[in-house]
Amino acid sequence: MCIRDRDAGAYRSLAEARVRKPAVDWTRVPVPRKTGRYLFCNYPLEELVPLVNWSYFFSAWGLPGRYPALFDDPKRGEEARRVFDDAQRLLSEIVDRRLLRADGVIGLYPAASDGDDIVLYADESRERERMRLPQLRNQQADRERNLSLADFVAPLGSGVKDYVGAFAVTAGLGLEELAGRYRSEGDDYRAIMAKLLADRLTEAFAEALHRYARVTLWGYEREGQWSVGDLLAEKYQGIRPAFGYPSAPDHSLKADVFALMDVGTVTGMTMTESYMIVPGEAACGLMLGHPEARNFSVGRIDSEQLASYAARRGTDSEKMRVLIPQHLIDM
């Protein structure tokens, strides 16, 4: 049966979408060298600079284009070069004077999937559940496979021991004071640029810690195996979807990861009642190591999946509507 959205086409029922999940080869599950939680406080900013994605920086500045080819654009190239030079000077000042601080925490835990849920276990015995992280599933009828992040974690009863990672990072500690000082001096330009640089450093930090997880914790990747360009293009094995990303649109799952790794205690990050991380230049999500794991978009879901997901999250459909309003089918 297909459901039709007035604006966005046809959707499969939840039952049909679940039948169309991908067939994953569970003989390829990576076995980690280490598990547990790892803290990275006051991380060296100079190590993050090479991982900054300047294309995204320019897009946020209103100058879309691929770096460094953007400099040759006949319309935007000159301005892009000027902004880049200014950003380099400010970035050097931030790094040299430690005007921002980067705190992060990652963890790797025994895990399994149970339907559309990811289950994390308390220890390697896998006898006691530590946490359940329900996931959403794509229902679009024009997709050959309807994906959920849970599809890339070995299922209960498979006999395969799998693992799931989590992360929470920020490179925005100190930004409020820094941007406030610039604004008090009448320098809104530098205040805006400092925020965008903190955003980019945060993403670079997430990339750096994901690389650490792949190389040191899972151990399926060698140090230096990928160039910076390859890392920014995400050519490596595994994914790190942050909550709020298209494959994990429910921001409330951040609270679960904060509780899992005690993020608010061991880092400078806090969380509001509306699941916004403070400072705002932060990212929080999951790390999946299976070579077939890939990013995708959940898109819109029907009322049946909304009710199922809400129940698995321990709430009701109306409250969940508030959390993911853009992902509901308009019947």
Where does each model-flagged region fall?
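Active-site loops and adjacent core secondary-structure elements that bind or stabilize anionic groups
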Residues: 1-192, 196, 217
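C-terminal accessory domains/tails appended to large, multi-domain proteins
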Residues: 146-331
